[in-house]
Every structure is written in C-alpha cells, then in structure tokens.
C-alpha cells in the first residue's frame, strides 16, 4: 500500500509539472488562474511539488494587474511568499480571538507545553478527536495547554462551536486556510503542532487515530505527561 501511495504521489507531481509547463503558453482564463492558485498552494505546502516553484513564478509573471488583484491572483502571490515554519523554529506570536471577543497572543500561553489543534467543524476526524483531547487536557493541565484554532470562517466556526462544549481554548485567527495553519504547511485537518514552554516548534503531525496524539505527546513531553489511553 505504501509503495502504491508513493507511486501515486510521484505521478501527481509529474502531472503538475507538465501542466504548469503547458500553462506558460496557454491563454490566461478564469479556469487557468484557478488552476494556478491550486498548484501554488501545493508547491508551498507539499515537498513533492517544491521543484515547480519557478514554473509558478513564470506563470504569475504573465498576469496583468486586474488578474493579479483577483482572488486567485492574490492567492498565488500569498503562497509564493509563504515561508513554512519548520520544527526547531520559534512559532510566530500571532493574535487570536475567542467566541466572546477576547484577544490573545500565543505568547500568553507560554510556560507550559502548548498543543495547537487545527480543526474544522465539517471534519469528521476532528470531531472524533474531541473526547481524547478532553481527557488529555483534564489529566495534564499542570504541564500542557491546548489551543484549538479553526480553519473555518468566523460564522461557520461559531455555528460549529455551539454544538460542542470545549474545556480548552477554542480560538480563531480570522484568516482561515491562509492563517497560521498555512504557515505550518498543512493542507488538511486535523493537524497538530507541539510547542515547547518557550514557544519553539517541537513536532508537527497531521491526521488523527485513537491513541496517536496521546502517544505522540508522551514521546516529546516525557515523564511529566500522563497517558490517557492505556
């Protein structure tokens, strides 16, 4: 199965490169621009596409001012400028807000390990992770702070939040998929980032399976962490 996945990934990347090469000479249409935006995001966030960045730049160079000012044009520029936050780097001290409008900075939570949980209300695995995250928070309050950050728009975030009772920080950066989640290079949710008490990125992971987050946190936090899935 792993070998088939690798083959599929390789073929998808090759198709991307060939399409971008063709796009350099094709007329710029709305569909062309939408496709360029999708590929720009892939190049920014997935290692297998990184080599095609020069092709994205060449295609972007063909855009006139109205095209660059379109939503897709702005998206391409955003992803071309995006610098991915890697493990070992300091996490940016971004501003977030809660459902009641209270403003926070990530630095407000320093002093304990910080688990960032990127989620969406339409994501099944995100919802499935809630019971385990709740246990983790209850058992490890002394050493760990959990901060959930939505990838939804504010209206959807509030709607979904009304259906769940979070016992931890449930926040929004107001930027959806172009917010902090993009800067970590994630292209799906749930996605998790563990920060040191000083705010350094210790580890990143994407996806959820029962017990995986519990095991992962113990691996990095060590003896001060209490497992909740035996």
Q: What is each model feature region?
A:
Residues 113-114, 190:
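Alpha/beta-hydrolase fold active-site loops
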Residues 221-230:
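Sec-dependent signal peptide cleavage junction
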Residues 1-104:
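Oxidative protein folding and maturation machinery
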Residues 166, 173-221:
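Thiol/disulfide oxidoreductase modules built on the thioredoxin-like
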Residues 136-177, 182, 186-189:
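Conserved segment of the thioredoxin-like fold in thiol-based oxidoreductases
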Residues 28-29, 110-112, 186:
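Active-site acidic short loop of glycosyltransferases
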Residues 110-111, 118-138:
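Conserved redox-active cysteine motifs that mediate thiol-disulfide chemistry
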């Amino acid at each position: 199965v792993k070998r088939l996945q690798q083959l599929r990934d390789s073929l998808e990347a090759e198709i991307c490169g060939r399409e971008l090469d063709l796009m350099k000479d094709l007329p710029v249409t709305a569909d062309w621009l939408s496709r360029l935006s999708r590929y720009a995001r892939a190049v920014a966030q997935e290692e297998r596409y990184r080599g095609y960045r020069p092709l994205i730049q060449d295609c972007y160079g063909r855009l006139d001012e109205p095209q660059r000012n379109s939503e897709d044009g702005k998206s391409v520029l955003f992803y071309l400028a995006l610098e991915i936050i890697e493990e070992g780097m300091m996490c940016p001290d971004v501003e977030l807000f809660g459902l009641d409008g209270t403003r926070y900075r990530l630095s407000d939570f320093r002093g304990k390990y910080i688990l960032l949980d990127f989620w969406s209300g339409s994501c099944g695995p995100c919802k499935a992770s809630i019971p385990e995250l709740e246990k983790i928070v209850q058992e490890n309050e002394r050493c760990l702070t959990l901060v959930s950050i939505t990838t939804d728009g504010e209206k959807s975030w509030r709607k979904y939040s009304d259906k769940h009772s979070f016992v931890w920080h449930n926040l929004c950066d107001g930027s959806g998929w172009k917010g902090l989640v993009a800067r970590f290079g994630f292209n799906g949710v749930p996605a998790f980032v563990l920060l040191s008490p000083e705010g350094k990125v210790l580890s990143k992971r994407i996806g959820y399976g029962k017990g995986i987050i519990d095991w992962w946190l113990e691996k990095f936090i060590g003896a001060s962490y209490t497992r909740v899935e035996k």
